[in-house]
Amino acid sequence: MIASKFGIGQQVRHSLLGYLGVVVDIDPVYSLAEPSPDELAVNDELRAAPWYHVVMEDDNGLPIHTYLAEAQLSSEMREEHPEQPSMDELARTIRKQLQAPRLRN
């Protein structure tokens, strides 16, 4: 069983670039099409660890979807980010939906 370090709805930071993001989905292992060596320089050990679908904002404040290895992310300690309120709102919305899912008949 593979354990993930981060959860859905959790705010994280890109370890190298410092961008704030919100985890929206988790894959236990790398699950996109097998990359060519030119596309993604990732070793097999990294591919076997959890990968995260993370929504971040680009330099213009527009949301972008990223696919990142667990090793590329770090925990975000602050809950409020006045410079990026949309990321705070996204995280709150996801956590709220996970706590009280709507039933559909």
Swiss-Prot record:
GO cellular component: cytoplasm
GO molecular function terms listed in the Swiss-Prot or TrEMBL record: DNA binding
Transmembrane segments: none
Single GO BP term: response to heat
InterPro entries: Hemimethylated_DNA-bd_dom, Hemimethylated_DNA-bd_sf, HspQ
Chief location category: cytoplasm
Alphabetical UniProt keywords: Cytoplasm, Stress response
A Pfam family that the UniProt record links to this protein: YccV-like
Localisation per UniProt entry: Cytoplasm
Presence of the UniProt keyword Metal-binding in the record: no
NCBIfam families, per the entry: PRK14129.1 (NF010729), yccV (TIGR02097)
Family: Belongs to the HspQ family.
Function: Involved in the degradation of certain denaturated proteins, including DnaA, during heat shock stress.
Name of the protein: Heat shock protein HspQ
Species of the source: Escherichia fergusonii (strain ATCC 35469 / DSM 13698 / CCUG 18766 / IAM 14443 / JCM 21226 / LMG 7866 / NBRC 102419 / NCTC 12128 / CDC 0568-73)
